[in-house]
């Protein structure tokens, strides 16, 4: 009986650890969800029949903090913005039902806006907020108040950008 209890306790711990690392995001296409590894930034499209595709490979191979990456839904039903809440890097993530040729993760900002140390606990340092313009988000550094405009596009990936709006020292 004691062994059974220990086994059950280990299973609960393993299940809760898994639940914290992976987060499911509903999409407006009810047959599909996105699964985000919040430690590494890997994104998979999961279809309700069990099929899955990798949209975005791991962005942080040595990811050791749960909740580091987050997806933000846009007004375009096929597009999310992925944010590294430690560094401010962000990507446009697009899923599709037309096939893998239409699934991608394109970098919007590949440069770190902050440089955390190994001991830093910077989860949620950076946050994004939607604006009235469907193509634009505001990126906030909650530690110092700096702001950036983040723009995505479904037509031309050359129109992706992240520009500083407010810089405080």
Regions found by a protein language model. Name each.
Residues 38-68:
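N-terminal, post-signal-peptide region of Sec/Tat-exported proteins
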Residues 20-25:
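Cleaved targeting-peptide boundary
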Residues 72-74, 129:
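Structural signature of eukaryotic scaffold interfaces centered on beta-propeller domains
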Residues 47-52, 92-102, 149-158:
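Extended intrinsically disordered, low-complexity coil regions enriched in Ser, Thr, Gly, Ala
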Residues 15-19:
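Sec/Tat signal peptide C-region and signal peptidase I cleavage site
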Residues 167-168:
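Conserved small/polar residues in nucleotide/adenosyl-binding loops
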Residues 4-13:
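Sec-dependent N-terminal signal peptides
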Residues 32-38, 79-85, 135-142:
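Short beta-strand motif characteristic of blades in beta-propeller domains
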């Amino acid at each position: 009986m004691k062994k059974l209890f220990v086994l059950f306790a280990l299973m609960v711990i393993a299940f809760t650890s898994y639940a914290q690392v992976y987060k499911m995001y509903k999409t407006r296409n009810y047959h599909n969800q996105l699964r985000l590894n919040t430690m590494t930034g890997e994104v998979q499209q999961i279809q309700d029949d069990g099929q899955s595709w990798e949209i975005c490979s791991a962005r942080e191979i040595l990811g050791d903090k749960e909740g580091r990456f987050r997806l933000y839904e846009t007004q375009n039903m096929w597009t999310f913005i992925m944010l590294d809440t430690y560094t401010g890097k962000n990507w446009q993530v697009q899923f599709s039902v037309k096939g893998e040729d239409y699934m991608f993760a394109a970098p919007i900002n590949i440069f770190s806006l902050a440089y955390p140390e190994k001991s830093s606990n910077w989860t949620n340092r950076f946050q994004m907020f939607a604006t009235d313009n469907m193509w634009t988000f505001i990126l906030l550094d909650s530690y110092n108040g700096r702001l950036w405009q983040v723009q995505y596009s479904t037509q031309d990936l050359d129109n992706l950008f992240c520009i500083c709006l407010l810089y405080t020292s």
